[in-house]
UniProtKB/Swiss-Prot annotation:
Annotated consequence of substituting D298A: Abolishes binding to CUB domain of TNFAIP6
Domain of life: Eukaryota
Underlying gene: ITIH1
Organism: Homo sapiens (Human)
Segments carrying motif Phagocytosis uptake signal: 181-184
Task of the protein: May act as a carrier of hyaluronan in serum or as a binding protein between hyaluronan and other matrix protein, including those on cell surfaces in tissues to regulate the localization, synthesis and degradation of hyaluronan which are essential to cells undergoing biological processes.
Family: Belongs to the ITIH family.
Carbohydrate-modified residues: C60, N285, N588, T653, N750
InterPro entries: ITI_HC_C, ITIH, VIT, VWF_A, vWFA_dom_sf
Official protein name in the record: Inter-alpha-trypsin inhibitor heavy chain H1
Subcellular location, record wording: Secreted
Length: 911
């Protein structure tokens, strides 16, 4: 059979928003208007280029907040030649894929989940060819995406089936399922079927389709609920999908939303099944607690423009919504730290008006004293214990907004974390809001987690004001503080987080665990908390008869969902905890999370899924991967791959190597190690050597604003002469970009991406292009590699091979700076300090001890130095022969030229 793609292929795209978005390639033509349900519709051809979607179904089963989704689509190719189908998937970041399968010609091709270390081998092979194997990620605010292209045989059909799972989170007093429907093509059988089972009973259920006229929505959306069960069915006919009576385009273009909540007549909602339990805690009819809240706001120069405008708009609205019993203050931090009052004041009408005037009037500063701003806000809240005891029963909250990294005062992230942790001491939660993409979000997440809060990214968009208000609305009404949920110690073998600093109106606390054998019947939960003016205490017992009844009604699904809910929450918590522990404990947590991911068949940041029996033109299997916040996804660059079933695999092809234009004159370090500094302002070059012992690690580039760094470790000759200084060279380089958790370790033997995360290992025999969240690495076979950082610099590592039979010398590396103009003014290091203009004057040129190398007097940094004119080699363009560079040589390890002594640049680690 012919596996070639026809002139036009069908594109079937499935996007998931919170749950799933479905999208297919548009049919020819465009809609001219919305249809009216009363208009008579004509039969139309639903095929595009001989391919039509026979069915597209989303089946969602929810059992006690645990949602299990199966998305099935069948595509039929009626053409006499093969067609290409692209299956694009966007899933919420909170979801775990558990299955993906493709069925064609009676054969099933099933996903196989493995640990990611094993899957890296697949990544490596795909990267070497400069293409992708279904791994390209394009994440939106809450989404993750992958794409699989498949060639479909003529006169045949193919069925895709995706399964994924998640725990629904309660916000604003309801659970919400949003499905964005956008087929752009008429579907013979389109269906969304949502089945809900909640043991507490369903108190409300609604379903809406923003894209349907009200009359048509009433005809096509069927919704019902009674007792424990709820059901929503959306099954429009082909004629009901048409955008106009004679159109072949679809009006299914918008959000399909299902919202529901459960009955809260009983405070206790405790399920026990199959030696696992799930406890849902969301008591009603509690009095809102008064709160003490301090807003800590970044007013550095980078906030100018829309950011500060939107921040002010949000603050004005938030202040207007505060209750008279609340107390508050505002702290602003730039280069300096200033507070509005310096202590908590009541949210009276006069104070709120004055605070709003303060917000309207503040102006921006320059740098970012994040540490100072946070400590000032913490100090204000801590005063409650010392000087305002009447406010000690309020719920205290600290909210910080920043759009960048610390650049003033304390800038070391580990020290800031320690300072904040020691100052808060567990008294109240810290919520960090990271505005835009230039913020170190992992840093904010760790800080929030260490202090009983959470971090949220605010996207730089037209709705940033609403994003800020939306976050505040979630924490605006605390009902309980210090919520402690306890279970019998002799009965519980494993437990998710059971202590929460605060419980807010409209939310829900979920705890799950594993129970020892024979302990189910006596299982109970004790809850203690502090409320407004009173203590909260309750004991929940398992109702055995009710559980038996539930098991009869829902059977295996209830047992299975309670256990998988526990596994889901446990894995999520283990992954989060990894961010704030040392390397040894991180490895232990990773091992636990990996084993659970494999046991329960979840695609998590530690696992990947490949599809057996499916391959592309180079024999690669498609791989489904889930990126994590602390280890961004690897993206292979190049043309997309089209996968075919095992019977249709064409012969392998090879991609061309990647080339990159290099500047005429560069700054770098090479050979023994000779530092070459090009000074464009003088149209001249300086050079110096560093004489140190093998094993020493030197800081070459360090940008404190971004954390970007390059360190190099020296190696010596294989055979060393006693009592003599033998040559040293760079044998290991570490390039790190903490903003994206990027690390690259380079040696003359291997190139390792993210070595701390078990990343892929490439050899110098590979030709590869890889991208990780704004960093592109190009490996040019047996020659060099180029690292390009968005909003940063471009750097080259040159490989030097020596004669294989040499008993003295060994392979080494050179490092060159190709572009540094976007690096910050604070960049330092043996090379980095010269990214900025440097002034010097040369005079009194006269013959030196070597007639071919004149000496001279150089005045630099207010020092007079004796320098020598000489030649060095630049290997950035020609790694084998190099090009001679004439330079002024500064003696004694660059003394007088470099800032401080060369020993100041010795660092303990490669990263």
């Amino acid at each position: 059979m012919d596996g070639a793609m026809g002139p036009r292929g069908l594109l079937l795209c499935m996007y998931l928003v919170s749950l799933l978005i479905l999208q297919a390639m548009p049919a020819l033509g465009s809609a001219t208007g919305r249809s009216k349900s009363s208009e008579k519709r004509q039969a139309v051809d639903t095929a595009v280029d001989g391919v039509f979607i026979r069915s597209l179904k989303v089946n969602c089963k929810v059992t006690s907040r645990f949602a299990h989704y199966v998305v099935t689509s069948q595509v039929v190719n009626t053409a006499n030649e093969a067609r290409e189908v692209a299956f694009d998937l966007e899933i919420p970041k909170t979801a775990f894929i558990s299955d993906f399968a493709v069925t064609a010609d009676g054969n099933a091709f099933i996903g196989d989940i493995k640990d990611k270390v094993t899957a890296w081998k697949q990544y490596r092979k795909a990267a070497i060819s400069g293409e992708n194997a279904g791994l390209v990620r394009a994440s939106g605010r809450t989404m993750e995406q992958f794409t699989i292209h498949l060639t479909v045989n003529p006169q045949s059909k193919v069925t895709f089936q995706l399964t994924y799972e998640e725990v629904l989170k309660r916000n604003h007093m309801q659970y919400e399922i949003v499905i964005k429907v956008k087929p752009k093509q008429l579907v013979h059988h389109f269906e969304i079927d949502v089945d809900i089972f909640e043991p507490q009973g369903i108190s409300k259920l609604d379903a809406q389709a923003s894209f349907l006229p009200k009359e048509l929505a009433a005809q096509t959306i069927k919704k019902s609920f009674s007792g424990k069960k709820g059901h929503v069915l959306f099954r429009p006919t082909v004629s009901q999908q048409q955008s106009c009576p004679t159109c072949s385009t679809s009006l299914l273009n918008g959000h399909f939303k299902v919202t529901y909540d459960v009955s809260r007549d009983k405070i206790c909602d405790l399920l026990v099944a199959n030696n696992h339990f799930a406890h849902f805690f969301a008591p009603q009819n509690l009095t809102n607690m008064n709160k003490n809240v301090v807003f800590v706001i970044d007013i550095s120069g980078s906030m100018r423009g829309q950011k500060v405008k939107q921040t002010k708009e949000a603050l004005l609205k938030i202040l207007g919504d505060m209750q008279p019993g609340d107390y508050f203050d505002l702290v602003l931090f730039g280069t300096r730290v200033q507070s509005w009052k310096g202590s908590l004041v009541q949210a009276s009408e006069a104070n709120l008006q004055a605070a709003q005037d303060f917000v309207r009037g503040f102006s921006l500063d320059e740098a970012t004293n994040l540490n100072g701003g946070l400590l000032r806000g913490i100090e204000i809240l801590n005063q409650v214990q010392e000087s305002l005891p009447e406010l000690s029963n309020h719920a205290s909250i600290l909210i910080m907004l920043t759009d960048g990294d610390p650049t003033e005062g304390v800038t070391d992230r580990s020290q800031i974390l320690k300072n904040v942790r020691n100052a808060i001491r567990g008294r109240f939660p810290l919520y960090n809001l990271g505005f835009g993409h230039n913020v170190d979000f992992n840093f904010l997440e760790v800080m929030s987690m260490e202090n009983n809060g959470r971090a949220q990214r605010i996207y730089e968009d037209h709705d940033a004001t609403q994003q800020l208000q939306g976050f505040y609305s979630q924490v605006a009404k605390p009902l309980l503080v210090d919520v402690d949920l306890q279970y019998p110690q002799d009965a519980v073998l494993a437990l998710t987080q059971n202590h929460h600093k605060q419980y807010y109106e409209g939310s829900e606390i979920v705890v799950a665990g594993r129970i020892a054998d024979n302990k189910q019947s006596s299982f109970k939960a004790d809850v203690q908390a502090h409320g407004e003016g009173q203590e909260f205490s309750i004991t929940c017992l398992v109702d055995e008869e009710e559980m038996k009844k539930l098991l009869r009604e829902r059977g295996h699904m209830l047992e299975n969902h309670v256990e998988r809910l526990w596994a889901y929450l446990t894995i999520q918590e283990l992954l989060a905890k990894r961010m704030k522990v040392d390397r040894e404990e991180r490895a232990n947590l990773s091992s636990q999370a990996l084993q659970m991911s494999l046991d329960y068949g979840f695609v998590t940041p530690l696992t990947s899924m490949s599809i057996r029996g499916m391959a592309d033109q180079d024999g690669l299997k498609p791989t489904i991967d889930k990126p994590s916040e602390d280890s961004p996804p690897l993206e292979m660059l190049g043309p997309r791959r089209t996968f075919v079933l095992s019977a249709l695999q064409p012969s392998p092809t090879h991609s061309s190597s990647n080339t990159q234009r290099l500047p005429d004159r560069v700054t770098g370090v090479d050979t023994d190690p000779h530092f070459i500094i090009h000074v464009p302002q003088k149209e001249d070059t300086l050079c110096f050597n560093i004489n140190e012992e093998p094993g020493v690690i030197l800081s070459l580039v360090q940008d404190p604003n971004t954390g970007f760094s390059v360190n190099g470790q020296l190696i010596g000759n294989k055979a060393r002469s006693p009592g003599q200084h033998d040559g040293t060279y760079f044998g290991r380089l570490g390039i790190a970009n903490p903003a994206t958790d990027f690390q690259l370790e380079v040696t003359p033997q291997n190139i390792t991406l993210n070595p701390g995360f078990g990343g892929p290992v490439f050899s110098w025999r590979d030709q590869a292009v890889l991208r990780q969240d704004g960093v592109v690495v190009t490996i040019n076979k047996k020659r060099n590699l180029v690292v390009s950082v968005d909003d940063g610099g471009t750097f080259e590592v040159v490989l030097h091979r020596v004669w294989k039979g040499s008993s003295v010398h060994q392979d080494f590396l050179g490092f060159y700076v190709l572009d540094s103009h976007r690096m910050s003014a604070r960049t330092h290091g043996l090379l980095g300090q010269f990214f900025h203009p440097i002034g010097f004057e040369v005079s009194d040129i006269h013959p030196g001890s070597d007639p071919t190398k004149p000496d001279a007097t150089m005045v630099v940094r207010n020092r007079r130095l004796t320098v020598t004119r000489g030649l060095q080699k630049d290997y950035s363009k020609d790694p084998w022969h190099g090009a001679e560079v004439s330079c002024w040589f500064i003696h004694n390890n660059g003394a007088g030229l470099i800032d401080g002594a060369y020993t100041d640049y010795i660092v303990p680690d490669i990263f």
